[in-house]
């Protein structure tokens, strides 16, 4: 009987019991074989397991026709997904897993239990999420760089303003000093005018100088008279 199983050929959609190492004969369906995997999996069929929605590549020796082996292998089993698989093969034999890809490769010898397709889908999503997080990280790194550049530009502008600010007060001081000098010159200019007014004679045509000069001349005349009288007095006293 096993010899006939090895020689039996299955086609897509055939319902079988598939035997994997470490697992009971499981309700399954012969699925499509991808063209890319035909050479590497010669004489092996891609099998879809009901209940678990996993896939594997198995040879004819590990496959048994469902109708012929239902009484032998279709007994209830405590393994998770087995009862669901028996229900699906009877009521929904065309079921497919969400995100199922027929190109996935599984081997009963290499893998004790085929992994569900959903796991691979989750891995892809996770990879995409990691990729997006990397992009976000780049953006976050770029933003501080831009902020640093902007801050550097602001610092440079502030430094230029500080350098210009001491020059401006100095220029303002120079302007103020010039204005003060101009004011002092203007304040000194009226003094000669006043001196000219004081030097003018009190009465026009009198020919006399200022009152102070007249007083000095009178004092000098009196002193000369006293000196002239002084010898006469001395001679009289000597007599």
From Swiss-Prot:
Heparin binds at residues 19, 21, 72, 75, 79-80. Its main location: nucleus. Disulfide bonds join 12-108. The modification Phosphoserine is found at residues 132-133, 165, 199, 202, 206, 238. A motif (Bipartite nuclear localization signal) lies at residues 155-170. Gene3D superfamilies: 2.30.30.140. Residues 91-106 have a biased composition (Polar residues). A motif (Nuclear localization signal) lies at residues 75-80. Residues 135-172, 180-197, 225-239 have a biased composition (Basic and acidic residues). Sumoylated with SUMO1. Sumoylation prevents binding to chromatin. Phosphorylation at Ser-165 is likely to be required for secretion. The modification Phosphothreonine is found at residues 184, 200. There is a cross-link at residue 80 (Glycyl lysine isopeptide (Lys-Gly) (interchain with G-Cter in SUMO2)). One of its GO terms (molecular function) is DNA binding. Residues 12-69 form the PWWP domain. Residues 69-239 are annotated as: Disordered. One of its GO terms (cellular component) is nucleus. There is a cross-link at residue 80 (Glycyl lysine isopeptide (Lys-Gly) (interchain with G-Cter in SUMO)). It is found in: Nucleus; Cytoplasm; Secreted, Extracellular exosome. InterPro entries: PWWP_dom (IPR000313). The modification N6-acetyllysine is found at residue 44. Acts as a transcriptional repressor. Has mitogenic activity for fibroblasts. Heparin-binding protein. Monomer, and domain-swapped homodimer. Interacts with nuclear proteins NCL and YBX1/YB1. The PWWP domain harbors the heparin-binding sites and is responsible for DNA-binding, while the C-terminal region is essentially unstructured. Belongs to the HDGF family. This is Hepatoma-derived growth factor. It comes from Bos taurus (Bovine). The gene is HDGF.
């Amino acid at each position: 009987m096993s010899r006939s199983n090895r020689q039996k050929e299955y086609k897509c959609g055939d319902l079988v019991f598939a035997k994997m190492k470490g697992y009971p004969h499981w309700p399954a369906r012969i699925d499509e074989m991808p063209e890319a995997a035909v050479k590497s999996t010669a004489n092996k069929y891609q099998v879809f397991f009901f209940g678990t929605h996993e896939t594997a590549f198995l040879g004819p020796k590990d496959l048994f026709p469902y109708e012929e082996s239902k009484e032998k292998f279709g007994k209830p089993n405590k393994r998770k997904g087995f009862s669901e698989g028996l229900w699906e093969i009877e009521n929904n034999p065309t079921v497919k897993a969400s995100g199922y890809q027929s190109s996935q490769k599984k081997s009963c010898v290499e893998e004790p239990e085929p992994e569900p397709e959903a796991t691979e889908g989750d891995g892809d999503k996770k990879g995409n999420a990691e990729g997006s997080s990397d992009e976000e990280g780049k953006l976050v790194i770029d933003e501080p760089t831009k902020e640093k550049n902007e801050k550097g530009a602001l610092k440079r502008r502030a430094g230029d303003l500080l350098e210009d600010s001491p020059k401006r007060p100095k220029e303002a001081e120079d302007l103020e000093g010039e204005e003060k000098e101009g004011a002092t010159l203007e304040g000194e200019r009226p003094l000669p005018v006043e001196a000219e007014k004081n030097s003018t004679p009190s009465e026009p045509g009198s020919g006399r100088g200022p009152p102070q000069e007249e007083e000095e001349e009178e004092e000098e005349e009196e002193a000369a008279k006293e000196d002239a009288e002084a010898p006469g007095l001395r001679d009289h006293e000597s007599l």
